[in-house]
Design a protein with these regions (language model features):
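Two-component/phosphorelay signaling modules centered on CheY-like receiver
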Residues: 15-34
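Receiver (REC) domain active-site loop signature in two-component systems and cognate sites
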Residues: 60
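Non-catalytic signal-transmission and effector/linker regions of two-component phosphorelay proteins
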Residues: 1-9, 22, 130, 134, ...
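Helix N-cap/capping motif at the beta->alpha junctions
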Residues: 35-44, 65
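Alpha4 helix (beta4-alpha4-beta5 surface) of REC/receiver domains from two-component response regulators
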Residues: 67, 88-105
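C-terminal output helix
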Residues: 91, 110-119, 123, 127, ...
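Active-site beta3 strand of CheY-like receiver
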Residues: 9, 49-55
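Active-site residues of response regulator receiver
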Residues: 12, 57, 85
Length: 158
């Protein structure tokens, strides 16, 4: 899948963080990046964006990142979710990883190379899942065709 076909949703209440990550990804990739300062607004737009990966801040005024990513999971369980946190609270982060099924978390300040690697690996998971879903659909189509051929053969010899 070309980078230009990939859509990332980025949610953080700090405009500087959004600008920094969006600018970095614009330089390093061709990903489409949609940014929101409000998780509530991001959820309102979620269905129309066709996202491949989500990055969310942990502490935000409207809704915390764990709740937001949990709601993303309810609607798009296959989409990797990454938590961006300014707190080295490993216990709560691990709880979030388990409870919400996070793909990964990144501590602020982040290293751009690490961020790029985590995003790339998360997207690879998405791409592999999409390929698997397509293969499953192909097998189902082939199975349906085979069933129809079997019915035709039975009618001919019946």
């Amino acid at each position: 899948m070309p980078d230009s076909d990939i859509t990332i949703l980025l949610v953080d209440d700090e405009e500087m963080v959004l600008t920094s990550i969006r600018s970095f990804l614009a330089i390093e990739t061709d990903y489409r990046v949609h940014t929101f300062t409000s998780p509530v607004k991001a959820l309102q737009e979620l269905d129309r964006l066709n996202i491949d990966l989500v990055i969310s801040d942990y502490l935000m005024p409207d809704m915390d990142g764990i709740t937001f990513l949990g709601r993303v999971k309810e609607r798009f369980p296959q989409v990797p979710r990454i938590l961006l946190t300014g707190y080295a609270d490993k216990e709560n982060t691990m709880k979030a990883i388990n409870d919400v099924g996070l793909y990964q978390y990144i501590e602020k300040p982040w290293n751009n190379d690490d961020l790029k690697l985590i995003i790339r690996n998360g997207l690879e998971k998405t791409i592999l899942l999409k390929r698997l879903e397509e293969r499953i659909r192909e097998v189902e189509r082939a199975q349906n065709e085979l069933t129809e051929v079997q019915k035709q053969i039975l009618r001919i010899f019946a």
